[in-house]
Amino acid sequence: SSVELMRVVLANVGSAPLTLTPTAAVPIFGRSADRARDHRHVTSLLHRIATHPYGVVVRPTLTFDERGHRFNTVAYAVLGAEGDGTAPVAVFPTLETFVGSGGSLDWPQAVVEPGLTGLAAGRRLAGYEAMGGLRFGRITLDPGQRCAYVLALGILDDDEDPEAMMARYGDDARFEAWLTRTKTHWDQKLASLQVDLGEARFNGWMKWVTLQPILRRICGNSFLPYHDYGRGGRGWRDLWQDQLALLLMEPGEVRDQLLSNFAGIRLDGSNATIIGDAPGDFRADRNNIPRVWMDHGAWPLLTTQLYMDRSGDLGFLLEEQEYFKDSWIQRAQAVDGSWTPEDGTKLRNSAGSVYRGSILEHLLVQHLTAFFNVGEHNIIRLEGADWNDGLDMARLRGESVAFTALYASNLRRLSALVVALSQLGVKELRFFAELVPLLDRLHAPLDYDSVSAKRARLAEYFAVTEHTIRGERVAVALQDLSADLAAKADWLYAHLRRQEW
């Protein structure tokens, strides 16, 4: 069930009897968070509201979408009962009936104005903002006496019955049983990773940090309708950082998800920014807002390294995966005019077949393109999305010393991993031919001190990978590949120490 349970306990902490009429109130928005900004009124007209013995059920007629409206298949319910299962005596199913004339949600007349009786079960209304206003029977609490109420906030499919939901959750004893089950579930989730640093508050905070990636998978990121940032989906960093947590907590699912994530990498070293719900579901950005972050190429290796360290699965580097392809090329600085949406979002070779490369090849694409993509100080450049606050505009001349250091460390890691592949009997690796010129130590070493030489080499690579690649593969010996990566890492380390430290 998609249900949130809430228990409210009223206690008389005074010295005299207290008489009151308890009222619970939960607004029912009942549609996409987008409608908080666009078409709020017209979508409220779609609401079909029913009063139920235990509360309010809203079933909109349509799911509003200007690209094509769809019949709605879910209902939104706010139901409640006293601790012993007794139903409310009346409900206020709309914002208008709950707030009253001249009232507000801070001072609703249904609560403060005598004589507003609410509606009984079995009433139907249409076209209003919905409200889960539940009035319970008038009670008198003696000093020290307590009274509990249980609320069930649910999203129901067509075949789900509100009565069944209340039978399952709707009294104090059932609430307590489900609360115990819920605590046990999350305690077991968190038990796989425990941190004790001798300070109780910090240990508790670490439990919350451990829990966050799981909640993010369930809820998305900034999913609140009035939040400043985000629409509930996950970004590129989230994919890899969430995998880090899952490696420690739920490692069984990680390998397939990790492999799927690599399908989002473009051949220019950037990556898809619109991420679907299913693993490996990456979509073309058609809103004409190219977004590239310079650090995005660094994170996949860190997650992959932890996976291999924990599993010993070095052969993962040899698994093959597709590349992402859309209209953006040259790290979103240009558009591939030959690409159309009908071409799909998978890189193809000149014969029209989908190209698949090893995971190691994907990692090389990310790191080699970053190595040559330098600014005037020979430090890896910032990209347009790194400074998008409308003021700094560091994309034009900005460089990042911190992430250059991370890429340097990663190149050293890659060099060591290449050597380690010999343990599997591997002697050479094969990569698409257009990538090999970026391994310049194999044929014609570049002067790494020359910014112009690096930029020219990267431009040559971009030019031959704009739309498709030939599909030819070139063999590279492990030792030669490792030496090239080590040379790049060594140069970056020395350059940073000499110029930036």
Question: What positions do the PLM features span?
Answer:
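Polysaccharide-binding surfaces and accessory modules of carbohydrate-active proteins
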Residues: 1-114, 165-192, 327-330, 334-341
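Short, glycine/acidic-rich hinge or "gate" loops at secondary-structure transitions
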Residues: 39, 162-164, 274-275, 314-324, ...
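Beta-strand-rich recognition/accessory modules
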Residues: 5-7, 33, 79-177, 388-406, ...
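Acidic/His metal-coordination segments adjacent to aromatic residues that form catalytic metal sites
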Residues: 216-224, 273-291, 382-398
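Extended ligand-binding clefts on enzyme/binding-domain cores
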Residues: 316-382, 386, 401-402, 437-501
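Acidic/polar, glycine-enriched structural segments that form the non-catalytic walls/loops
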Residues: 117, 134, 139-140, 145-231, ...
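Aromatic-rich carbohydrate-recognition surfaces in CAZymes
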Residues: 144, 239, 246-254, 258-376, ...
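Inter-helical turn/loop segments and adjacent helix faces that build the functional surface
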Residues: 13-17, 159-160, 310-319, 414-430, ...
